Design a protein with these regions (language model features):
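S-adenosylmethionine/decaboxylated-SAM
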Residues: 2-176
Length: 176
């Protein structure tokens, strides 16, 4: 509510990094009614021990067929909004997306790969494409998990490096 009232208008452009099954994306649409919502997720089942307990780890909770089905589900969930050009879906990593992106965003929600290096790059890239007085929100701040505290470490790294204002609460973080 605070973000909607003070930062995000109905003509806003919103980016979500890490869409998974689209549940939070749906909430973004319902609560903010943006002009455009861009969803970015590679929908890849990752290899390696580090990903074993993640939502997208091949040896844990997922495999590539499941990820492919999630991608199809998200496209079906937003079929109407895609036709209306209100939602656009990119099946690629956030790095790949940012390399070709020309848009600026009012709000960027980061919920992609939670390992430090990925979150750090997502924040770096997001800051380049954030509109003046825009907001960045990160998922799982100060929460522990398979990601070895990567979200919190990336935020602390940027807090030292950038002139940013950090607001914490409900495990979300705001940059502007």
């Amino acid at each position: 509510k605070l973000i909607k009232e003070h930062f995000i208008g109905e003509n806003s452009q919103i980016l979500e990094i890490g869409t998974h099954r689209g549940n939070f994306s749906k909430q973004i649409l319902e609560n903010f009614n943006p002009k455009k919502l861009i969803l970015v997720d590679p929908w890849i089942a990752f290899e390696g021990k580090i990903y074993k307990n993640s939502w997208y780890g091949r040896s844990g909770h997922s495999n590539q067929e499941i990820q492919n089905n999630y991608y199809i589900e998200v496209n079906q969930l937003f079929e109407k909004e895609i036709i209306e050009n209100k939602v656009e879906i990119f099946r690629k990593t956030s790095d790949e997306f940012f390399n070709k992106n020309l848009n600026k965003f009012d709000l960027i929600y980061i919920d992609g790969n939670h390992l430090f290096e990925f979150v750090r790059r997502d924040i770096d890239n997001s800051l380049k494409f954030l509109k003046k007085n825009g907001v960045i929100i990160l998922d799982d701040y100060k929460l522990k998990g398979w990601w070895d505290d990567g979200v919190t470490k990336a935020i602390k790294f940027h807090e030292k490096e950038k002139n940013i204002k950090i607001i914490t609460g409900h495990n979300l973080l705001n940059y502007h």
